[in-house]
From Swiss-Prot:
Complex formation: Monomer.
Annotated EC: 2.8.4.3
Organism (species): Bacillus velezensis (strain DSM 23117 / BGSC 10A6 / LMG 26770 / FZB42)
Functional note: Catalyzes the methylthiolation of N6-(dimethylallyl)adenosine (i(6)A), leading to the formation of 2-methylthio-N6-(dimethylallyl)adenosine (ms(2)i(6)A) at position 37 in tRNAs that read codons beginning with uridine.
HAMAP family: tRNA_metthiotr_MiaB
Location(s), subcellular: Cytoplasm
UniProt keyword annotation of Lipoprotein present: no
Protein name: tRNA-2-methylthio-N(6)-dimethylallyladenosine synthase
Region (Disordered): 1-20
Amino acid sequence: MNEKQKQESGQVNPADKTSEKDYSKYFEAVYIPPSLKDAKKRGKESVQYHNDFKISEEFKGLGEGRKFYIRTYGCQMNEHDTEVMAGIFMALGYEATNSVDDANVILLNTCAIRENAENKVFGELGHLKALKKNNPDLILGVCGCMSQEESVVNRILKKHPFVDMIFGTHNIHRLPELLSEAYLSKEMVIEVWSKEGDVIENLPKVRNGKIKGWVNIMYGCDKFCTYCIVPYTRGKERSRRPEEIIQEVRRLASEGYKEITLLGQNVNAYGKDFEDMTYGLGDLMDELRKIDIPRIRFTTSHPRDFDDHLIEVLAKGGNLLDHIHLPVQSGSSAMLKMMARKYDRERYLELVGKIKAAMPNASLTTDIIVGFPNETDEQFEETLSLYREVEFDSAYTFIYSPREGTPAAKMKDNVPMRVKKERLQRLNDLVKEISAKKMKEYEGRTVEVLVEGESKNNPDILAGYTEKSKLVNFKGPKDAIGKIVRVKIEQAKTWSLDGVMAGEAIEVK
């Protein structure tokens, strides 16, 4: 839904008049509910690009004397969205706070990828109910991917009526209007665009620190894997223009950032929606590598769209890091077909072979789902054998979690939970075994570490990450924070490395 369509739509009441209860009569304010059916549609409307975002004069000062708090769940994209919302809050005059007790506005920026993530949010709403009761003027909002689901909005309406506002992933730029409406309205304000919005540039951001920065390069996903809710909650693929991305990265470099991560639900599809030119992720990376910033990463990749040109560009090295997160999900071609991943085991292994041939020292990590409907013991063994063959540095592993509205949710979940847990344990044992083996290879070596701060467990120890995203803990001066230093590894653990600074030099680049 672009701005014009939004204006034409007006206020929309729930379409389902046969629902258990018709809440539309209670709403005098904005009420645009989500629709997964509408979210499935991929229209041919051209994406509009807006470079003229600004806070309307009527909303300036809205936050004067008020504080905001945002709790973020889920992926890096949500963290990026939180940075944008924080920027809008600050532009409105709000002050950030780290305590819900001090906040005048609390937002939960939610994740819908798995049931466990949603349960955490509903649990948090339960905790915040008492806070809202003691402070009726508190504005409590739910945003992010969960808000795009009809079942979630209906549950909030029925079980958490003290929530003041709900909005989704496509209309973050309308936060000033929604806040104003929430202050004025006696009823819950709901505005969720089921269809994706335009690409809005020049949104304010409050970044977390000055060392590493997120740079969004595209929005949405068109892959429709049968288990995944993201194409519905994030909309169709829309790429930012390359000149906007390059300008943002240059600005971060000039501000002293040492590392940027390019973000997208499927970064490898970048540029496929451009109608006026042929330009992909490889072309963008080839431009960005010329910028004077030490490290550039990207996430998340889809094997189907990982092309040869990108591999050629990454092989040039320099500030383009050879750590690649390449989700496989399963090692069984039959399972991959049921998941609608659009590649098979052989195609994935062929891609891995190309990457390793071009970048022999590349570090590969992955995502794997166990217990997908109809997964047999033999098919699970194929996943284990693929993991051994590739020798991933690490993996995010999950038990299959049905998501309402996805094709897989209609499949019979016929793998017993006991079997799912056994498979997850066996997979995790293998992940730990290979990770420990690969980490052991670092002992005695000197690596470059981007120092992010003090260790969470010991303030006398500094912590940072290597180019291959290995966590390193070491003793060093506090002025090393924010710099890239050389560290000699003395001891390898399963998930981290311990070392000492090599020599007196602090910054190596």
